[in-house]
Amino acid sequence: MVGEIPVLLIMKKPIVVSGDVSVYDVAKLMVEQDVPCVLVVCERPNHESIEVATDKDIIKKVLIRKLPPDKVKVEDISSGKLVTIPPNTTIDEALEIMNKYKTNELFIVDDGKIVGVITEEDLIKIAPEIISTLKELVNYLLQIIDEVTSGDISDKSKEIQNINQGKDNKKDSESDIRKKKIMLIK
């Protein structure tokens, strides 16, 4: 049930940076915005491309190699391997795609444009909220079932039918019938 929710409902707007920005500035932005990745617009000879830079890229390609993050451009560590999905993809499908492509982020594309991003972390964070909402829904449905099975609603339904039959017999005015129905609901 939870897994059938489309990613469109939980996606975030991606953060986009220019490829000539330093890794240091991108890392700082990622920490400030609490995101594990950014889209990078790279100006390559003869074409422009959109790539992704992740927190793991910064660690593996800059910090582990002891390169100065303020001197390395983000386009030098970004990857063109964007995994994209349509907005109606379900959470279950998104998780399967993440596992298949061994990625922690998916980019949502609509009409050829990137409109959102969803990360494994987003899916983990959203799970408790979804579970809480589902618990509320289940409790509400159980309450309705209890009312129906206790006869309370069916008794009221019968009373409304009796009131309506009284209307057919012209015993009560329309106003009297409305008043009786309102009193019944209260």
Curated annotation (Swiss-Prot):
Keywords: CBS domain, Repeat. Signal peptide: none annotated. SUPFAM superfamilies: CBS-domain pair. Residues 10-69, 77-133 form the CBS domain. PANTHER family: CBS DOMAIN-CONTAINING PROTEIN, CBS DOMAIN-CONTAINING PROTEIN CBSX3, MITOCHONDRIAL. This is Uncharacterized protein MJ0450.
